[in-house]
């Protein structure tokens, strides 16, 4: 059932950040930085897939996603929800159920046998499709799915990520250039604010994380990762 109450966006962002800490989805390792799909190296990592294992948490997060979409996109803007392989698929199912909409999922590439399909499920030509991912860094993976939906005849004007890194100016430009409005609930700044408030990181760790968030590509380049985004 679609919820129609609208929490303050700042409250939802703070609550999601607290949830991610509570379920131990936030990880830090500056000595051996995490490698992201973009090729970047990062001292911090968020595992949003863990949200699925906590029913009360995931229900609240879906409430937040619905409120964000209804507030910022509208009530009758979508014909279908598309989940990106693989982490976006379960969240697409949950969101589609909340919004009483059909669901499809999109592979990163055609499967190479059978119908050689990249999109699974029924999507009418011209359907207005919302693409969902658990998180997005700079938008590259989301546009893999957006481009596939558009190539198959769908219309994509909106995407949603439960968590958005929010530290790359290039990301905002990518979505603007791609004519897609990105919706999201929380960013790294929200997670860091909770860490500071609840003293979840010591001062040295906070400083290292802030150094990354303030200049992520420079930090990545110094630590064995890419220093530019494609």
Curated annotation (Swiss-Prot):
One of its GO terms (biological process) is 'de novo' UMP biosynthetic process. Keywords: Glycosyltransferase, Magnesium, Pyrimidine biosynthesis, Transferase. Pathway: Pyrimidine metabolism; UMP biosynthesis via de novo pathway; UMP from orotate: step 1/2. One of its GO terms (molecular function) is magnesium ion binding. Its cofactor is Mg(2+). 5-phospho-alpha-D-ribose 1-diphosphate binds at residues 107-108, 111, 113, 133-141. Its EC number is 2.4.2.10. Belongs to the purine/pyrimidine phosphoribosyltransferase family. PyrE subfamily. Homodimer. HAMAP family: PyrE. This is Orotate phosphoribosyltransferase. The gene is pyrE.
